[in-house]
Design a protein with these regions (language model features):
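Transmembrane-helix motifs of polytopic, lipid-linked glycan transferases
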Residues: 118, 122-142, 180, 184
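Transmembrane-lumen/periplasm boundary regions of multi-pass, lipid-linked membrane glycan transferases
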Residues: 50-53, 58-63, 92, 98, ...
Length: 318
């Protein structure tokens, strides 16, 4: 007769199941709330561009997987690129626009369960639900159930975020993928053998909006700090002599920091760009030139001034 496993007790299992259901229920409520709220929101200027091009992107992918056409530079350029800086909205990656188009084709044209505009906007709403679920489960792991519910509700009840999540645009999806990348990076610091999730999610964030290029700077600072702390602890545990010369100590510290969780760095550096490349057909032909054109467009983009709380902000970066 074996001793009972307390972690596998029926009560414990029911508790875990209940906590999971709470998280998924909060995500579902978020999607419903966003989908209901967006019905009273008019079409934003950018949405019209993303909807039009997203429908064409979706048709191209469907034609590809149904063998209606092959992969050629001509078909990719005609759908995703062109000689002009804004031809076929090539200045923005294709991921979310493609999802907008696929959603409209499935939910509106095929199933007929939502209006055309709602169907285009549904991927953003679903993404916001995913964000609430991710926040819930991360906080649940770190602090507990009450804190997780509070954190998820605070995200759900952000008015501006709910507004953006109801648009067929990139702002809400990129927020979700930023958080997902950070969460995957944090989990990768546990020393797992291959933290591929961080790289793939960062690649999807890049394929959503160019602002994801800033994410490694924030993660890099954090990695440097935790790596230095870990290196210092390891040195103390080994009772190493502090008599080494400063250059030797600096070199040892650099090796320790880089090697602390090096697989996370490799995941971001390799899988991130690779994922971006795979989901954006415009990069399949002449990728170096097209990436340069993509970045050049945004580094020299016209500045939009705006008024906030009675003040007119005219100078970048505001």
């Amino acid at each position: 007769m074996t001793a009972p496993d307390p972690t596998g007790a029926p009560g414990a299992r029911r508790g875990r199941t209940a906590r999971r259901l709470i998280g998924w229920a909060l995500g579902l409520v978020t999607v419903i709330a966003v989908a209901a709220n967006q019905r009273d929101v008019g079409i934003a200027r950018d949405e019209a561009v993303y909807m039009q091009n997203g429908a064409r992107y979706a048709d191209w992918w469907i034609g590809l997987v149904t063998f209606g056409h092959g992969i050629s530079e001509r078909s990719v350029t005609r759908t995703f690129g062109g000689p002009g800086a804004t031809d076929n909205n090539r200045e923005h990656p294709a991921l979310m626009k493609t999802l907008f188009g696929l959603s409209e084709r499935l939910v509106h044209r095929t199933l007929g369960v939502a209006s055309e505009v709602t169907a285009f906007r549904l991927p953003s709403a679903l993404g916001h639900g995913v964000l609430v679920v991710l926040v819930y489960f991360l906080v649940l792991e770190l602090w507990g159930l009450a804190e997780a519910i509070a954190a998820a509700l605070l995200v759900l009840l952000l008015p501006r975020a709910v507004f953006h999540a109801g648009l067929a645009c990139f702002d809400a999806p990129t927020m979700t993928l930023w958080f997902a990348t950070v969460a995957a990076y944090w989990r990768g610091l546990d020393g797992r053998r291959w933290p591929w999730q961080a790289g793939v999610l960062w690649g999807l964030a890049l394929a959503t909006k160019h602002t994801a290029l800033l994410l490694p700077f924030a993660l890099g600072v954090h990695y440097l700090i935790v790596g230095l702390v870990a290196a210092r602890r390891a040195r103390r545990a080994r009772s190493e002599s502090t008599g080494a010369t400063p250059p030797r100590r600096a070199l040892a510290a650099a090796r320790a920091v880089i090697g602390y969780r090096w697989r996370v760095i490799v995941s971001l550096a390799v899988l991130g760009p690779l994922t971006l490349y795979l989901v954006w057909p415009w990069l399949w032909f002449d990728p170096v030139h097209h990436v340069q054109a993509w970045l050049a467009f945004h580094t020299s983009h016209v500045h939009y001034n705006y008024e906030y709380l009675g003040r007119n902000w005219n100078a970048p970066p505001f």
